[in-house]
Amino acid sequence: MTDASINASMTREEEASLGDYFALLKPRVMSLVVFTAFVGLMAAPIGVHPVIGFCAILFIAIGGGASGALNMWWDADIDQVMKRTKGRPIPAGKVDKGEALSLGLALSGLSVIMLALATNVFAGAFLAFTIFFYVVIYTMWLKRATPQNIVIGGAAGAFPPVIGWIAATGSMSVEPWLMFALTFLWTPPHFWALALFMRNDYDMADVPMLTVTHGRRSTRKHILVYTVILAAFALTTAFTSVGGPIYLTTAVVLNALFLKGAVQIWRRDEEICESDNFKIERSFFKLSLLYLFLHFGAILAEALLKPYGLGGW
């Protein structure tokens, strides 16, 4: 598909609705940002006034949405090619690229300034860095440059609990980085599982995902290796200041299931995968979402129960 045909097909066909502009913010991704940032905020040792806490999470969410809009602006050409993304507002002809850029920039500035005013300058600055990392380092550079794109770029999605912690404390410590590392190590097996059954999409869009550059067999090995590392870290985290019996129980069960799934994926025959439409890979991808949500849910439970002597060790 030529650039001219891509631009022509992205010409606005009708007036955009509020829902179309909201879709630019990647609400599903934003929900993960909101939840992990909230856990980081609540796990902090310094209590935050509910109004300030609400404002902090709101502005972090807006910053995450701004990143999504800028990502869609830059990736409009490949979104048009991929089946998974061609229904997004820009390739669907509902929102102009210029509008997405303007919205993303405006929300970026708003979120950073308001978070700094509502909490502290350190939190605002870290949010600004996160937006920059996701948009410039990952979207504009790494995504189309290397099969390690989501390994390095995954840091952007792992920063929200750190921002939440800083918003509450105004300082840095080891605890938020444990939450960062949990998300950072989770990102590769999560996205590589998606890439296993969406390989053709990435290939057509000329995105060098590991499945495209190294093949599915190599990707399966990488998923297994990263899952083993993730499981070891997740279980070790249970014995740190953010862990406790609730987290340990959750981690044991979830990592047993996740490791089992990774081994199943590693052993899979490609012909069988094609015949059952990557059933196991799709299930593993869905499990990965539950995996991260429940780990952070357990960290949140430990933090909420700790003042009553029921959380932590």
Curated annotation (Swiss-Prot):
Keywords: Cell inner membrane, Cell membrane, Heme biosynthesis, Membrane, Transferase, Transmembrane, Transmembrane helix. GO terms for molecular function: protoheme IX farnesyltransferase activity. Gene3D superfamilies: UbiA prenyltransferase. It is an enzyme of class 2 (transferase). GO terms for biological process: heme O biosynthetic process. It holds the Pfam family UbiA. The chain crosses the membrane at residues 22-42, 46-66, 98-118, 121-141, 150-170, 177-197, 223-243, 246-266, 284-304. Interacts with CtaA. Belongs to the UbiA prenyltransferase family. Protoheme IX farnesyltransferase subfamily. This is Protoheme IX farnesyltransferase. It comes from Ruegeria sp. (strain TM1040).
